[in-house]
Regions:
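Core catalytic lobe of class I
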Residues: 1-217
Length: 217
């Protein structure tokens, strides 16, 4: 795996990597030039990457959602009419404990945090300890902006990041949304069929995926 330290364009044979802020890179791509988008944007309020104006440190959930809507308008422009978007998002809580930081061992191994605490904000509807519901806020906002919300997939994590909580279950899942810009789009159901005891041809892919988080290479 090549780690890119600076923004820029990197090529190797037919492969091309654009490295930079999505809000800067996407406008440089041709309309309708992308078949599939797989993305996990910065989760709201859970990590500071030390970049001015970064996505994820907006003052309110609404501001974060609006930024996501704006970014995905540009995603829609570059996406082919038969293309798909697979969007992974985690959640956070409104908490008085400040920003939650991942356990160093897990952070060093590149593990993703689940629904962690967010510094408490003054909000007309969010109360202390409320689960904010960021993934669904974004999904519904994109739906309202014209995207087809085709599927919600639960990413089940058998080895989630530990949480020091005693008044709720430990978070062990995140969401993955399948979004399209058209009613008809390319989706190869046969390529992802699951084994089934009662059928030699298998069964249609289910919407709960059990995948262990793995360390970065």
């Amino acid at each position: 795996m090549v780690r890119l330290a600076h923004a820029g364009l990197y090529t190797q044979g037919a492969d091309m990597i654009h490295h930079g802020d999505v809000r800067t890179i996407l406008p440089t791509l041709k309309a309708g030039s992308v078949q599939c988008v797989v993305t996990s944007p910065p989760y709201w309020g859970l990590r500071d990457y030390g970049v001015t104006g970064q996505i994820g440190l907006e003052p309110t959930p609404e501001a974060y959602v609006e930024n996501m809507v704006q970014v995905f308008r540009e995603v829609k422009r570059v996406l082919r009419d038969d293309g798909t978007v697979w969007l992974n998002l985690g959640d956070s809580y409104n908490s008085t404990s400040g920003f939650s930081r991942a356990n160093k061992q897990w952070a060093r191994k590149g593990r993703d945090g689940g629904a962690n605490d967010k510094k408490e904000i003054k909000h007309p509807t969010l109360k202390t300890k409320d689960l904010i519901g960021i993934p669904w806020r974004v999904a519904f906002a994109l739906q309202a902006d014209g995207w087809y919300l085709r599927s919600d997939i639960v990413w089940h994590k058998p080895n989630p990041m530990p949480e020091s909580v005693t008044d709720r279950p430990t978070k062990s899942h995140e969401y993955l949304f399948l979004l399209t810009k058209s009613v008809q789009y390319y989706y190869d159901a046969e390529a992802v069929r699951e084994p089934a005891q009662d059928s030699k041809s298998g069964r249609n892919l289910r919407s709960v995926w059990t995948i262990n988080p793995k360390p970065y290479a």
